[in-house]
Amino acid sequence: MSDINGTRLPWLATCPCVGEDVNPTLSRGER
């Protein structure tokens, strides 16, 4: 699981387009 997390962080940073799409989704889930 740790490996996936480490790979996911840099992946999102490299793909700001996808990160923006996931940002609103995560914010909604937290709210």
Curated annotation (Swiss-Prot):
Residues 1-10, 17-31 form a propeptide. Keywords: Toxin. One of its GO terms (molecular function) is toxin activity. There is a cross-link at W11-P16 (Cyclopeptide (Trp-Pro)). It comes from the Eukaryota. Processed by the macrocyclase-peptidase enzyme POPB to yield a toxic cyclic hexapeptide. POPB first removes 10 residues from the N-terminus. Conformational trapping of the remaining peptide forces the enzyme to release this intermediate rather than proceed to macrocyclization. The enzyme rebinds the remaining peptide in a different conformation and catalyzes macrocyclization of the N-terminal 6 residues. InterPro entries: Amanitin/phalloidin. Belongs to the MSDIN fungal toxin family. This is MSDIN-like toxin proprotein 4.
